[in-house]
Amino acid sequence: DFSSKNDELTALSPSVQRGNIIRLTTAQALAGANTTVIFATGSIVGNALAPDKSLATLPITIFVIGMAMGILPTGAIARRYGRRTSFLVGTSCGVITGLLATLAVLMSSFWLYCLATFFGGAYTAVVLSFRFAAADGVEAAKKARALSFVMGGGVVAGIVGAHLVTYTMHLWSSYMFAATYLAQAAVAALSALVLMGIKLPMPTVEEATGGGRPLSLIIRQPLFITAVICGAVSYSLMNFLMTAAPLGMKMGGHSQESSNL
Protein backbone atom coordinates (compact mmCIF):
# COMPACT_ATOMS: atom_id res chain seq x y z
CA ASP A 1 0.00 0.00 0.00
CA PHE A 2 0.97 3.71 -0.02
CA SER A 3 2.42 3.71 3.49
CA SER A 4 4.66 0.70 2.86
CA LYS A 5 5.86 2.27 -0.40
CA ASN A 6 6.63 5.48 1.49
CA ASP A 7 8.56 3.50 4.11
CA GLU A 8 10.68 1.92 1.37
CA LEU A 9 11.49 5.32 -0.09
CA THR A 10 12.42 6.65 3.33
CA ALA A 11 14.78 3.70 3.73
CA LEU A 12 16.63 4.76 0.57
CA SER A 13 19.40 7.16 1.52
CA PRO A 14 19.63 10.55 -0.25
CA SER A 15 22.76 9.34 -2.06
CA VAL A 16 20.88 6.29 -3.40
CA GLN A 17 18.02 8.50 -4.57
CA ARG A 18 20.47 10.84 -6.31
CA GLY A 19 22.15 7.82 -7.88
CA ASN A 20 18.80 6.63 -9.22
CA ILE A 21 18.18 9.97 -10.90
CA ILE A 22 21.67 10.09 -12.40
CA ARG A 23 21.31 6.55 -13.75
CA LEU A 24 17.84 7.16 -15.16
CA THR A 25 18.88 10.44 -16.77
CA THR A 26 21.94 8.81 -18.31
CA ALA A 27 19.91 5.82 -19.49
CA GLN A 28 17.32 8.17 -20.99
CA ALA A 29 20.04 9.95 -22.97
CA LEU A 30 21.44 6.64 -24.21
CA ALA A 31 18.33 4.53 -24.72
CA GLY A 32 16.28 7.42 -26.05
CA ALA A 33 18.71 7.69 -28.96
CA ASN A 34 17.12 4.48 -30.29
CA THR A 35 14.07 6.39 -31.50
CA THR A 36 16.18 9.06 -33.19
CA VAL A 37 18.24 6.44 -35.03
CA ILE A 38 15.17 4.63 -36.31
CA PHE A 39 13.36 7.77 -37.42
CA ALA A 40 16.50 9.11 -39.11
CA THR A 41 17.23 5.91 -41.02
CA GLY A 42 14.01 3.88 -41.14
CA SER A 43 12.40 5.28 -44.27
CA ILE A 44 15.72 5.45 -46.14
CA VAL A 45 16.63 1.85 -45.36
CA GLY A 46 13.03 0.84 -45.99
CA ASN A 47 13.13 2.49 -49.41
CA ALA A 48 16.37 0.67 -50.25
CA LEU A 49 15.16 -2.76 -49.10
CA ALA A 50 11.42 -2.73 -49.84
CA PRO A 51 10.17 -4.92 -52.70
CA ASP A 52 7.71 -2.11 -53.43
CA LYS A 53 8.74 1.52 -52.84
CA SER A 54 5.28 2.29 -51.45
CA LEU A 55 6.33 0.22 -48.42
CA ALA A 56 9.31 2.46 -47.64
CA THR A 57 7.81 3.87 -44.45
CA LEU A 58 6.35 0.56 -43.22
CA PRO A 59 9.31 -0.06 -40.84
CA ILE A 60 8.41 3.14 -38.97
CA THR A 61 4.79 2.00 -38.78
CA ILE A 62 5.96 -1.34 -37.38
CA PHE A 63 8.07 0.58 -34.86
CA VAL A 64 4.99 2.47 -33.61
CA ILE A 65 3.01 -0.78 -33.45
CA GLY A 66 5.81 -2.40 -31.44
CA MET A 67 5.79 0.53 -29.03
CA ALA A 68 2.01 0.32 -28.56
CA MET A 69 2.08 -3.45 -28.09
CA GLY A 70 4.99 -3.23 -25.66
CA ILE A 71 3.40 -0.85 -23.17
CA LEU A 72 1.10 -3.28 -21.35
CA PRO A 73 3.65 -6.16 -21.13
CA THR A 74 6.21 -3.65 -19.87
CA GLY A 75 3.84 -2.55 -17.13
CA ALA A 76 3.00 -6.16 -16.24
CA ILE A 77 6.69 -7.09 -15.87
CA ALA A 78 7.35 -4.00 -13.75
CA ARG A 79 4.34 -4.72 -11.56
CA ARG A 80 5.28 -8.36 -11.03
CA TYR A 81 9.09 -8.26 -10.88
CA GLY A 82 10.02 -4.61 -10.41
CA ARG A 83 11.02 -1.80 -12.73
CA ARG A 84 14.68 -2.82 -12.84
CA THR A 85 13.76 -6.16 -14.43
CA SER A 86 11.48 -4.38 -16.88
CA PHE A 87 14.33 -2.04 -17.83
CA LEU A 88 16.73 -4.90 -18.48
CA VAL A 89 14.18 -6.72 -20.63
CA GLY A 90 13.69 -3.50 -22.57
CA THR A 91 17.37 -2.86 -23.14
CA SER A 92 17.72 -6.47 -24.31
CA CYS A 93 15.13 -5.61 -26.95
CA GLY A 94 17.34 -2.65 -27.85
CA VAL A 95 20.34 -4.90 -28.40
CA ILE A 96 18.20 -7.26 -30.50
CA THR A 97 17.00 -4.27 -32.54
CA GLY A 98 20.52 -3.25 -33.50
CA LEU A 99 21.70 -6.77 -34.28
CA LEU A 100 18.65 -7.67 -36.39
CA ALA A 101 18.80 -4.37 -38.26
CA THR A 102 22.48 -4.93 -39.04
CA LEU A 103 21.73 -8.43 -40.30
CA ALA A 104 18.81 -7.09 -42.36
CA VAL A 105 21.07 -4.56 -44.09
CA LEU A 106 23.73 -7.20 -44.77
CA MET A 107 21.13 -9.63 -46.16
CA SER A 108 19.05 -6.95 -47.91
CA SER A 109 16.01 -8.33 -46.06
CA PHE A 110 13.13 -5.87 -45.79
CA TRP A 111 10.96 -8.04 -43.57
CA LEU A 112 13.81 -8.78 -41.17
CA TYR A 113 14.33 -5.04 -40.93
CA CYS A 114 10.64 -4.61 -40.07
CA LEU A 115 11.07 -7.20 -37.30
CA ALA A 116 14.03 -5.21 -36.01
CA THR A 117 11.98 -2.02 -35.83
CA PHE A 118 9.23 -3.90 -33.97
CA PHE A 119 11.75 -4.74 -31.24
CA GLY A 120 12.86 -1.11 -31.40
CA GLY A 121 9.31 -0.06 -30.60
CA ALA A 122 9.16 -2.44 -27.65
CA TYR A 123 12.45 -0.95 -26.42
CA THR A 124 10.98 2.54 -26.65
CA ALA A 125 7.93 1.44 -24.63
CA VAL A 126 10.29 0.67 -21.76
CA VAL A 127 12.22 3.92 -22.18
CA LEU A 128 8.96 5.84 -21.82
CA SER A 129 8.62 4.44 -18.30
CA PHE A 130 11.92 5.90 -17.07
CA ARG A 131 10.20 9.14 -16.05
CA PHE A 132 7.72 7.25 -13.89
CA ALA A 133 10.53 5.30 -12.27
CA ALA A 134 12.19 8.61 -11.45
CA ALA A 135 9.06 9.72 -9.61
CA ASP A 136 8.80 6.36 -7.83
CA GLY A 137 12.44 6.41 -6.73
CA VAL A 138 12.47 9.64 -4.73
CA GLU A 139 10.51 11.27 -1.94
CA ALA A 140 7.43 13.32 -2.84
CA ALA A 141 9.22 16.67 -2.45
CA LYS A 142 11.82 15.68 -5.06
CA LYS A 143 9.52 14.17 -7.71
CA ALA A 144 9.25 17.28 -9.90
CA ARG A 145 13.00 17.80 -10.00
CA ALA A 146 13.62 14.12 -10.72
CA LEU A 147 11.15 14.20 -13.62
CA SER A 148 12.76 17.32 -15.09
CA PHE A 149 16.22 15.73 -15.05
CA VAL A 150 15.05 12.56 -16.79
CA MET A 151 13.02 14.49 -19.35
CA GLY A 152 16.13 16.58 -19.99
CA GLY A 153 17.95 13.35 -20.79
CA GLY A 154 15.47 12.92 -23.63
CA VAL A 155 16.71 16.16 -25.20
CA VAL A 156 20.27 14.84 -25.04
CA ALA A 157 19.03 11.60 -26.62
CA GLY A 158 17.98 13.47 -29.76
CA ILE A 159 21.47 14.90 -30.12
CA VAL A 160 23.19 11.60 -29.33
CA GLY A 161 21.05 9.67 -31.82
CA ALA A 162 21.55 12.13 -34.68
CA HIS A 163 25.31 12.25 -34.23
CA LEU A 164 25.49 8.47 -33.81
CA VAL A 165 23.99 8.10 -37.28
CA THR A 166 26.20 10.81 -38.79
CA TYR A 167 29.49 9.43 -37.48
CA THR A 168 28.82 5.73 -38.13
CA MET A 169 26.72 5.50 -41.29
CA HIS A 170 29.71 5.18 -43.64
CA LEU A 171 32.04 3.17 -41.38
CA TRP A 172 31.03 -0.05 -43.15
CA SER A 173 31.44 1.35 -46.64
CA SER A 174 29.72 -1.48 -48.51
CA TYR A 175 26.65 -1.42 -46.27
CA MET A 176 25.35 2.01 -45.33
CA PHE A 177 23.96 2.17 -41.77
CA ALA A 178 25.15 -1.36 -40.86
CA ALA A 179 27.73 0.09 -38.47
CA THR A 180 25.08 2.50 -37.17
CA TYR A 181 22.88 -0.34 -36.03
CA LEU A 182 25.81 -2.16 -34.45
CA ALA A 183 26.56 1.04 -32.55
CA GLN A 184 22.90 1.25 -31.57
CA ALA A 185 23.12 -2.26 -30.09
CA ALA A 186 26.25 -1.24 -28.17
CA VAL A 187 24.53 1.86 -26.80
CA ALA A 188 21.58 -0.27 -25.66
CA ALA A 189 23.99 -2.62 -23.88
CA LEU A 190 25.67 0.37 -22.23
CA SER A 191 22.26 1.59 -21.09
CA ALA A 192 21.63 -1.83 -19.53
CA LEU A 193 24.89 -1.59 -17.58
CA VAL A 194 23.86 1.83 -16.28
CA LEU A 195 20.45 0.54 -15.19
CA MET A 196 21.79 -2.57 -13.46
CA GLY A 197 22.85 -0.44 -10.50
CA ILE A 198 19.49 1.21 -9.97
CA LYS A 199 17.74 0.67 -6.64
CA LEU A 200 13.98 1.17 -6.68
CA PRO A 201 11.21 0.01 -4.32
CA MET A 202 9.84 -3.40 -5.23
CA PRO A 203 6.13 -3.65 -6.05
CA THR A 204 3.79 -3.97 -3.09
CA VAL A 205 1.71 -7.14 -2.73
CA GLU A 206 -1.34 -5.27 -4.02
CA GLU A 207 0.58 -4.02 -7.06
CA ALA A 208 2.11 -7.41 -7.81
CA THR A 209 -1.25 -9.17 -7.68
CA GLY A 210 -2.92 -6.64 -9.93
CA GLY A 211 -4.73 -4.64 -7.26
CA GLY A 212 -6.27 -1.31 -8.13
CA ARG A 213 -8.92 -0.15 -10.56
CA PRO A 214 -9.66 -2.43 -13.52
CA LEU A 215 -8.69 -1.19 -16.98
CA SER A 216 -12.33 -1.35 -18.09
CA LEU A 217 -13.15 1.32 -15.50
CA ILE A 218 -10.17 3.53 -16.32
CA ILE A 219 -10.84 3.70 -20.07
CA ARG A 220 -14.35 5.05 -19.46
CA GLN A 221 -13.09 8.12 -17.61
CA PRO A 222 -13.36 11.43 -19.54
CA LEU A 223 -9.85 12.47 -18.52
CA PHE A 224 -8.43 9.21 -19.88
CA ILE A 225 -10.36 9.55 -23.14
CA THR A 226 -9.18 13.15 -23.55
CA ALA A 227 -5.56 12.16 -22.89
CA VAL A 228 -5.74 9.32 -25.42
CA ILE A 229 -7.21 11.58 -28.11
CA CYS A 230 -4.59 14.28 -27.49
CA GLY A 231 -1.81 11.69 -27.52
CA ALA A 232 -3.08 10.05 -30.70
CA VAL A 233 -3.38 13.36 -32.56
CA SER A 234 -0.01 14.72 -31.43
CA TYR A 235 1.86 11.47 -32.11
CA SER A 236 0.19 11.17 -35.51
CA LEU A 237 1.35 14.65 -36.48
CA MET A 238 4.85 13.96 -35.21
CA ASN A 239 5.09 10.64 -37.04
CA PHE A 240 3.65 12.18 -40.20
CA LEU A 241 6.42 14.78 -40.24
CA MET A 242 9.32 12.65 -39.01
CA THR A 243 8.67 9.44 -40.94
CA ALA A 244 8.93 10.76 -44.48
CA ALA A 245 11.13 13.82 -43.84
CA PRO A 246 14.55 12.06 -44.03
CA LEU A 247 13.60 10.25 -47.24
CA GLY A 248 12.05 13.38 -48.72
CA MET A 249 15.16 15.43 -47.92
CA LYS A 250 17.42 12.83 -49.50
CA MET A 251 15.29 12.66 -52.64
CA GLY A 252 15.30 16.46 -52.72
CA GLY A 253 19.08 16.56 -52.91
CA HIS A 254 19.94 17.26 -49.27
CA SER A 255 22.81 15.42 -47.61
CA GLN A 256 22.19 12.52 -45.25
CA GLU A 257 23.93 14.52 -42.51
CA SER A 258 21.32 17.26 -42.87
CA SER A 259 18.40 14.85 -42.67
CA ASN A 260 19.92 13.24 -39.57
CA LEU A 261 19.69 16.56 -37.77
Where are the predicted features?
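Juxtamembrane intracellular "pre-TM" segments in multi-pass secondary transporters
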Residues: 3-18, 198-229
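C-terminal membrane-cytosol helix-exit motif in multi-pass small-molecule transporters
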Residues: 161, 165-167, 185-206
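C-terminal ends and interior cores of transmembrane alpha-helices
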Residues: 92-107
